Every structure is written in structure tokens, then in C-alpha cells.
Amino acid sequence: MGEWLDQVYCEDTLQGITRLPDQSIDLIIADPPYGLGKDYGNDSDKLEAEAYLAWTQRWVDAVLPKLKPNGSFYIFLTWRYSPEIFVMLKQRMMMVNEIIWDRRVPSMGGSTRRFSSVHDTIGFFAKSKDYHFDLDAVRIPYDAETKKARSRSIFVGAKWLELGYNPKDVWSVSRLHREHRERADHPTQKPLEIIERMVKASCPANGVVLDPFMGSGTTAVAARRCNRHFVGFEMNPDYCRLIEQRLAALETSETA
């Protein structure tokens, strides 16, 4: 393993990605700016549609060679651009799932000319049909009542009742609010529950996860909690310091 392992570089992915050897990454989790004008401390979210899609293609083509032949790729998207980006990605990879993250936010106010948007779109892609996927690691336990009822069914084996069921492609996980303990100072921080599900399912033990847009560092935290390695890039110096703080706090809690 190289010196780049378990590092977050405070630089643009397009500049720093050459640090990584080709076919060295098991899983890529990308949460790029959505092109909606949010403030990330730079101009990364203020591109017009055509420029945004061209930029997306550039960074995708830069990171995909780093993925192993059996590697996987998850990308968070807004509905505004997911159709175009899915088409672009399907020209390069095999699409496994479209996942809907239901952020469990109340539908109040907003536009009176369209339905309220309360979800993010997640694309799950793989480099080949032999992609790594550990379903047992992310099964959801049945509750006692369901387990009792299904134990009488000839269609459900005892093993599957104990292991739990396959998560569906709609993930209802609350977005992070100020009262959540894991909340950090970042406008689009993703819940650990979601990132850890991706890591456990799609990265083998001791494998490597790449995050091209580290943000608050949730991917690094999830990888460490799941006994995987990580590497990533983040342009904002304030967020780089935040990532250091979160990883240090995790290390302290593990040794306490």
C-alpha cells in the first residue's frame, strides 16, 4: 500500500487524482456539488448546466481508471441532472441500482407550481458483472412479530429470517439536523447510516474507499468505523480541518 492511503488531500480531485495508482480503489463514493448555488466556500456549485455536466464528465473520467475491475461507484445527484449523468455513466459502467434517499423532511411551503422535492437520487454503478457486493453485511433485521409470522412460510428459510431482509431501493433516513450528535458544520452532510451501508456492501474488508469530494469527511469516518481504508480530496481548507477533527475524535473514542 502507498503513502496515499488513509489520507485526505486538501486539493482539487482533478489535480490530485494522479497520486493514486490505477486499479487501486475498491469503491468510489461521490457527493459532488449539485450545481444549485450552495455555498461551499468556493465557486464549485455555481456552474451553469452545460458547464456543470461537462465538469462532471471530466472528473468521472479522471477517477474511474483508479477503480479495480470488480469495483463499484455510488454518486449522489439531484433530479435536475440525474438523467443526463446516468446516460453518461451508463456509457462507461454497468448500472446496478437507482436508489432514492427519502430525507424524511416535512413538505411545507416551497413552490406552488410543482410537487415538493424531498429526496436525493443515488446512482449505483459497477465496473463489471463481477462487482463485490456483500448483502449479508447490510441486511435489515426482521422485527419479532414478522419473524414469528414468516417462520411458518415455506418460502422463507430460517437462515434468511435470522439474517434479515434485503434493503429496498428507497432509503428512508432522516437528513441531519442540528440536534443530531454526528452533525458537523457542512451544508450537505450525509448521514453515516447511508455511507456505512455503501461501504459494508460494496467494499471488501481492508479495501479502499475513494471520495473525490470529502466535504465534512463522513466517508473517511465511515470507512474507519467499518475497518476499511480511505483516500479523498477536499478543496475547502475549513472542511479539511473539520475532517481532521472528526477523525481525531473517532480515534479518541476508539481508544477510550
Where are these regions (language model features)?
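Core catalytic lobe of class I
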Residues: 1-241
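Short, conserved SAM-binding/catalytic segment
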Residues: 1-4, 244-256
